[in-house]
Curated annotation (Swiss-Prot):
Compartmental location: Secreted, Extracellular space, Apoplast
GO molecular function list: serine-type endopeptidase activity
Residue ranges of every copy of the PA domain listed in the record: 365-454
Stretch forming the signal peptide: 1-24
Species per Swiss-Prot/TrEMBL record: Medicago truncatula
Protein name, as recorded: Subtilisin-like protease
Length: 748
């Protein structure tokens, strides 16, 4: 009897232990499911600020429980870009951590979005001259590309004739075997955390393209499907490249990886950082790129970022911090042209990358599927969405499809599946006259919104409408270039409307550069892509050229040089236009279109030291703790004379004007000739008066600084009727230089 009771007791204990273990495992699994990566900012301690990375790592670990699985949960420890770390926590653990006095903040990380031959000539860069002379071409400068990795074997990254990297370079290469890294591609790191850590090979194709745009070598006979044929080169062909992979196709681009990449890049010794990604408008103390870029600026590193592809609406920007160069996108004067010719003889030009040589010029039946549907199906058919055309006989016909909802490639496949033999893509009103060279799956052309309306009217009013496509190949010399493309994000900045953004526009439409996989069965592979992702590395490369010429210039001085020398007219000599062919406003263009040749010799610059941003940040109303997250030193705004945004020594003015006058100062640094005199020229915004004192300034030595003041005086309110903002400029003119800054005024 006792033995039986003992067996029952043992069995009961075993069952209870098993239940307990199962419950523990279930809780563990539940915790694992609830784990999220948190970005943790810690109050900076002077005792550990100068410690080695290992000591810093141990200090960060001290904030976590002793029983905590540090090795499995700690993601990154930051040294340069932040006082803090990234760690996997449950919400409960994060809440407990935030209760510690030394913790400034702990918040879940977010995922950032990517902003996705002829351009050097278009920008005035010529081999053997100026910035492209043999002793420049970006020589000695290191550009860090924070992106999706790279295809390192592309000839755009060969190192023939290149010297070793500068002695300051501390980075390393995670590619193994052979000569993958070289004197061109000097470093490559993968910051994407995964179960199996892999080398930083490209998996989106984005990073290879952006790296080549910034600093690709000269490659002859580059083209895509035989189009845009010529010598491909980045902006700074002799600059060194360091690659930091932060994105993959499974988890996107995490902010913990981006902060880690910026942290490592600064430590490695890069001179320029290029980031073609962003998060939208955020407080700067929550924006990983703004935080990392401030640390970069403190260390003399220039940071260039894409403005985003969320235009053409106002206040759609990413990367708004004033210590970042925010880059919008413009067209170039090269187009890959085709036209839609109608049965009435009218012809409407557009673009396509697919240029068949043998397409018949015979007029074919032309249909608009949106004419056949009912209710919601009408819109689906007008957009040529997948499956929407299966009940329509399109055999042997040219099909008109509206742009939108799905890619043009998908629309083309639907047309093909339904028997269509050619496609005309009609832009939406938002796209206007912006067209793109795309490798369609059938003969096709994208035409403007206005052309699309006319073609629809022709179809509706004609008994048997007909059309054909005429393919014209690559045409150079569009007098309307540069123009602002529809997708380029616009200002004003949401987070800091007193700083004009974007800063600049640069080439971002139909850009040919290196690609990881051939799209036309030709090796080496190139592709043509559009986006502010493309305009950003153009400016990164141009910054590298300027840095090579002027190694002692600060990031703010380089930015000023780029902005104050920008073009405001297109090749036809009229103001730069937008996608509607209306004059582009200041919130689309910023200072204007980059002119690298002039930027190398600006005459004067508006310089800013890192500490100058603290009064500005206090003026934004940020708390001391929030500012400390950005600047990484102790701040007390009560002891700082805060300034309004427009008082920052920025190479533009953006003011919100009511009924009272506003008064600001700026300081100029002479980087031109020692003895020079400048006089002010004003383009005064609508309904405004302006006074500049002094109106003439004289310099007697290089690096001399002179200040001036500007008063903005509101005029009669009736003059503002039907206007929400005005724009103008202030230019200091000498016999050799014109140093222009744009002015935006929002009326309240």
């Amino acid at each position: 009897m006792m033995k039986m009771e003992l067996r029952l007791l043992v069995s009961l204990i075993f069952i209870l232990c098993s239940i307990s273990m199962l419950a523990a495992e279930e809780n563990l699994e539940h915790d694992q499911i609830n784990l999220m990566t948190y970005i943790v900012h810690v109050k900076k301690s002077e005792n550990v600020a100068s410690h080695q990375s290992e000591d810093l790592h141990s200090w960060y670990h001290s904030f976590l429980p002793q029983t905590f699985p540090h090795k499995e949960r700690m993601v990154f420890s930051y040294r340069k870009v932040a006082s803090g770390f990234a760690v996997k926590l449950t919400p409960e653990e994060a809440k407990s951590l935030q209760e510690k006095g030394e913790i400034v903040s702990a918040r879940p990380e977010r995922t950032l979005e990517l902003h996705t031959t002829h351009t050097p000539t278009f920008l005035g860069l010529k081999q053997g001259q100026g910035l492209w002379s043999d002793d420049n071409l970006g020589k000695g400068v290191i550009i860090g590309i924070i992106d999706t990795g790279i295809f390192p074997l592309h000839p755009s990254f060969n190192d023939e004739g290149m010297p070793p990297p500068p002695a300051k370079w501390k980075g390393h290469c995670e590619f193994t075997g052979g000569q993958v890294c070289n004197n061109k591609l000097i470093g490559a790191r993968n910051l994407v955390k995964s179960a199996i850590q892999e080398p930083p090979f490209e998996n989106f194709f984005h990073g290879t393209h952006t790296a080549a745009e910034a600093a690709g070598r000269f490659i002859e006979d580059a083209s895509v499907f035989g189009n845009a044929k010529g010598v491909a080169a980045g902006m700074a062909p002799n600059a060194h490249l360091a690659i930091y992979k932060v994105c993959n196709d499974k988890i996107g681009c995490t902010e913990s990886a981006i902060l880690a990449a910026m942290d490592i890049a600064i430590e490695d010794g890069v001179d320029v950082l290029s980031l073609s990604l962003g998060l939208g408008s955020l407080p700067f103390f929550e924006d990983p790129i703004a935080i990392g870029a401030f640390a970069a600026t403190q260390n003399g590193v220039f940071v260039s970022c894409s403005a985003a592809n969320s235009g053409p609406g106002y206040s759609t920007l990413s990367n708004e911090a004033p210590w970042i160069l925010t880059v919008g996108a413009s067209t170039i004067d090269r187009k890959i042209v085709a036209s839609a010719k109608l049965g009435n003889g009218e012809e409407y030009e557009g673009e396509t990358l697919f240029q068949p040589k043998d397409f018949s010029q015979q007029l074919l039946p032309l249909v608009y599927p949106g004419s056949f549907g009912y209710g919601n199906q009408t819109q689906n058919q007008s957009l040529c969405l997948p499956g929407s055309l299966k009940n329509i006989d399109l055999s042997g016909k040219v099909v008109l499809c509206d742009v939108g909802n799905v890619s043009s490639i998908v629309k083309g496949q639907e047309v093909l599946n339904s028997g269509g033999i050619a496609m005309i893509l009609a832009n939406s009103e938002a796209l206007g006259f912006s067209t793109f060279a795309i490798a369609h799956v059938l003969p096709a052309v994208e035409v403007s919104y206005a052309a699309g309306l006319t073609i629809k009217s022709y179809i509706k009013s004609t008994y048997n409408p007909t059309a054909t496509l005429i393919f014209k190949g690559t045409i150079i010399g569009d007098s309307l270039a540069p123009s602002v493309v529809y997708f380029s994000s616009r200002g004003p900045s949401q987070e800091s409307p007193g700083i004009l953004k974007p800063d600049i526009i640069g080439p971002g439409v139909n850009i040919l550069a290196a690609w990881a996989v051939s799209v036309d069965n030709k090796i080496p592979a190139f592709d043509i892509v559009s986006g502010t992702s493309m305009s950003c590395p153009h400016l990164s490369g141009i910054a590298a050229l300027i840095k090579s010429s002027h190694p002692d210039w600060s990031p703010a001085a380089i930015k000023s040089a780029i902005m104050t020398t920008a073009n405001t007219l297109n090749l036809g000599g009229i103001p730069i236009l937008d996608q509607r062919l209306f004059p582009a406003d200041i919130f689309a263009t910023g200072a204007g279109h980059v002119n690298p040749v002039k930027a190398n010799d600006p005459g004067l610059v508006y310089d800013i030291e890192p500490e100058d941003y603290v009064p500005y940040l206090c003026g934004l109303g940020y708390s001391d703790k929030e500012i400390e997250v950005i600047v990484q030193w102790k701040v007390k705004c009560s002891n700082v004379k805060s300034i309004p945004e427009a008082q920052l020594n920025y190479p533009s003015f953006s003011i919100l004007l009511g009924s009272d006058s506003q008064y600001y100062t700026r300081t100029l640094t002479n980087v031109g000739f020692a003895n020079s005199t400048y006089k002010v020229e004003l383009e005064v915004p609508l309904a405004l008066g302006m006074s500049v004192n002094p109106s003439e300034i004289t310099f007697t030595e290089v690096n001399e600084k002179v200040s001036f003041s500007v008063e903005f005086i509101p005029q009669i309110k009736e003059n503002r009727r039907n206007h929400t903002f005005g724009q103008g400029s202030l230019t200091w003119v000498s016999d050799r230089h014109a140093v222009r800054i744009p002015i935006s005024v929002i009326f309240k």
